[in-house]
Amino acid sequence: MAESWLRLSGAGPAEEAGPEGGLEEPDALDDSLTSLQWLQEFSILNAKAPALPPGGTDPHGYHQVPGSAAPGSPLAADPACLGQPHTPGKPTSSCTSRSAPPGLQAPPPDDVDYATNPHVKPPYSYATLICMAMQASKATKITLSAIYKWITDNFCYFRHADPTWQNSIRHNLSLNKCFIKVPREKDEPGKGGFWRIDPQYAERLLSGAFKKRRLPPVHIHPAFARQAAQEPSAVPRAGPLTVNTEAQQLLREFEEATGEAGWGAGEGRLGHKRKQPLPKRVAKVPRPPSTLLPTPEEQGELEPLKGNFDWEAIFDAGTLGGELGALEALELSPPLSPASHVDVDLTIHGRHIDCPATWGPSVEQAADSLDFDETFLATSFLQHPWDESGSGCLPPEPLFEAGDATLASDLQDWASVGAFL
């Protein structure tokens, strides 16, 4: 293997006898395998084919590669690149590099007779070929076999090519929305269906716009299309909110109904205000965080809520006395217990509060009225003692008639419950 690499690179003999008769490998062998110096010195424009070594043959054809002096070059190892000059930006495949010899260029497409040249593929898509076959048939519909026949008759390349192109024709007919399948009638002879061009895409397909398969267009239901045409234009992004005419009519009828039936004659003014059109609502601009303090108007509204909420100040004698002075118009009912003669001790948080002067006469008058009532009851009882003879008493029978009837019914219910037990 080492001898082959050294012989191809021209580095000299692969083996040299040493002083001891052994084999010595030169450093050029390692450099030829690992060095990439040839890649930096490689130039496409200045590439020249090296001459063959005298008296030797090149069985592998390595020296036919232009501009490659190193055996490790990928161009030398690829036999598909033989005989084809390389151009930057244009990759060369193995099939195209072997077809034409050097110096022979392919003819332009206009000068090629596709009906007789079996080596040049027509520069048309399969959809275009199908459309051309349908147009050439002069019929409204065509079968799949007729499409195959027209393509092979007019393009010699497909007569000698692999028959897999027929699968591509069938796939285009099935997947392309430009073609419609027409079922065969019962009385028509033959097998299979027909194909024709969709009139919606006929003009664009014939002009060459549908050389490749496109996505199907979006179809809108006719009902939605009419509704979209009847509705007004869309609401603009900026500006006040607009309401359609139907909503305005409903709002007007609701206002008229509530203004006539829901409001009486005495509230005519309020009903009149309801019938007025509603003002447009203006959106409030949010205040930045730096202006979170209340405005002067808000401070005026919050002014009555301000006050001294200190408990010591609230229960101060002077403050509480001033508050109790406002209770003079109220009638305070004193307690009905005999302890009303005792002085009331008002003490809050260890602070004594004097009893108002208005409480004194009311307590004394209530005590006098209580004594008078007790005296009146005692004297009336003494004047009308209980008559034990029974002449002035009610007979006990009427008093217990209702009670006896209720007691008898209760006992009867309990007897029925006892039977179940």
Curated annotation (Swiss-Prot):
Gene3D superfamilies: Winged helix-like DNA-binding domain superfamily/Winged helix DNA-binding domain. Transmembrane segments: none annotated. It is found in: Nucleus. GO terms for molecular function: DNA binding; DNA-binding transcription activator activity, RNA polymerase II-specific; DNA-binding transcription factor activity; DNA-binding transcription factor activity, RNA polymerase II-specific; RNA polymerase II cis-regulatory region sequence-specific DNA binding; transcription cis-regulatory region binding. Testis, oviduct, lung and brain cortex. Residues 1-34, 48-116, 261-302 are annotated as: Disordered. Residues 120-210 bind DNA. Residues 271-284 have a biased composition (Basic residues). InterPro entries: FH_FOXJ1, Fork_head_dom, FOXJ1, TF_fork_head_CS_1, TF_fork_head_CS_2, WH-like_DNA-bd_sf, WH_DNA-bd_sf. The keyword Lipid metabolism does not apply. Keywords: Activator, Ciliopathy, Cilium biogenesis/degradation, Disease variant, DNA-binding, Nucleus, Primary ciliary dyskinesia, Transcription, Transcription regulation. SMART domains: FH (SM00339). Residues 90-99 have a biased composition (Polar residues). GO terms for biological process: actin cytoskeleton organization; axoneme assembly; brain development; cell maturation; central tolerance induction; ciliary basal body organization; cilium assembly; determination of left/right symmetry. Residues 66-80 have a biased composition (Low complexity). The keyword Transcription applies. GO terms for cellular component: chromatin; nucleus. PANTHER family: FORKHEAD BOX PROTEIN J1. It is linked to Allergic rhinitis: A common disease with complex inheritance characterized by mucosal inflammation caused by allergen exposure. Ciliary dyskinesia, primary, 43: A form of primary ciliary dyskinesia, a disorder characterized by abnormalities of motile cilia. Respiratory infections leading to chronic inflammation and bronchiectasis are recurrent, due to defects in the respiratory cilia. Patients with this disorder also develop significant obstructive hydrocephalus. Other more variable features include infertility and about a 50% chance of situs inversus or other left-right asymmetry defects. CILD43 inheritance is autosomal dominant. Transcription factor specifically required for the formation of motile cilia. Acts by activating transcription of genes that mediate assembly of motile cilia, such as CFAP157. Binds the DNA consensus sequences 5'-HWDTGTTTGTTTA-3' or 5'-KTTTGTTGTTKTW-3' (where H is not G, W is A or T, D is not C, and K is G or T). Activates the transcription of a variety of ciliary proteins in the developing brain and lung. Belongs to the FOXJ1 family. This is Forkhead box protein J1.
